[in-house]
Amino acid sequence: MNVSNAPRFNLLTILGPTASGKTRLAVNLARELGGEIISADSRQVFRRMDIGTGKDLHEYGEVHHHLIDILEPGEEFSVFAFQRLFLEAVGDICGRGRLPLLCGGTGMYLDAALRRYRMHEVPEDREWRASLEGVGDGELASRLREFRPGLHNSTDLVDRQRTIRALEIARFQADCAGDDEPFPDLRPLVIGIRWERAELRRRITERLRQRLESGMIEEVRRLNDGGVPWERLDYYGLEYRFVGMYLRDELSRNDLFQKLNSAIHDFAKRQETWFRRMERNGVAINWVDGGGGPLSEARRVILDNSYHLATGR
């Protein structure tokens, strides 16, 4: 398939829950469309975290990818940094006449790319924070409500540090109002992969077995031996948290598999909930059946959203 001239979209997005086959579909479409893949995965940015994050780099072949293996484990990375690097990658790819394909399942990253609003990385203002030492919690809450009049019973008001951080962000955003660069003219076409629940559960379980057999435990051990503390590995998600517990003799091998498998199933449900919320917030997702030939269905969606085809239609 070869789409030419002026498609209605200039960003193709492939999303879906874990183990749904996103990477394979994105790679196949990138080959056909002359595209490059931008990862929307919060953990694949880190080097040497390959098996636990499901990078599947062998599937990419000659297809160029972005935002994978760009940081050392332990370095900070945020949704704000993702949005900045995502926009840089889009500009680079489009500037070379190629099509960017966003692929991943991290909901916050997908939102940051698709909902077309600029995000600010808000630094801590230590001098301003010091000035609040004598300010009572009630006064802090009152100041926050001045920035956010509709705020009622928010979790931001439960803890003093959360209130201070929320107020810090609100002040920063107010100071930056009107200073934003315009968001690029992105016209995304979003394709989601959907599976029957029982089949997705089977795929998740089988993939976990394969990862454990392929050296995931050894990968986590090497990361810890290389200086990444257990607390940081816990932060990097389910696979690293549960394998770390196993390596610290807090779980048996059988419990590792059973508990991690159950946790990943629950995670997939949360991803699906996030995707439904994206739809309610105005993101149009074209769903294809993972078990019914997703590549052919995706081709049809793409052709339906293209002005001109190489066949001359």
Swiss-Prot record:
Q: What is its EC number?
A: 2.5.1.75
Q: Keyword tRNA processing, does the record have it?
A: yes
Residues the record lists as binding substrate:
T18, A19, S20, G21, K22, T23
Q: Which GO terms describe its molecular function?
A: ATP binding; tRNA dimethylallyltransferase activity
The prosthetic group or cofactor this protein requires is: Mg(2+)
InterPro entries per record: Dimethylallyltransferase (IPR039657), IPT (IPR018022), P-loop_NTPase (IPR027417)
Family the entry assigns: Belongs to the IPP transferase family.
Could you tell me which PANTHER family the record lists for this protein? TRNA DIMETHYLALLYLTRANSFERASE
What role does this protein play?
Answer: Catalyzes the transfer of a dimethylallyl group onto the adenine at position 37 in tRNAs that read codons beginning with uridine, leading to the formation of N6-(dimethylallyl)adenosine (i(6)A).
Q: Identify this protein by name.
A: tRNA dimethylallyltransferase 2
Q: Which organism is it from?
A: Pelobacter propionicus (strain DSM 2379 / NBRC 103807 / OttBd1)
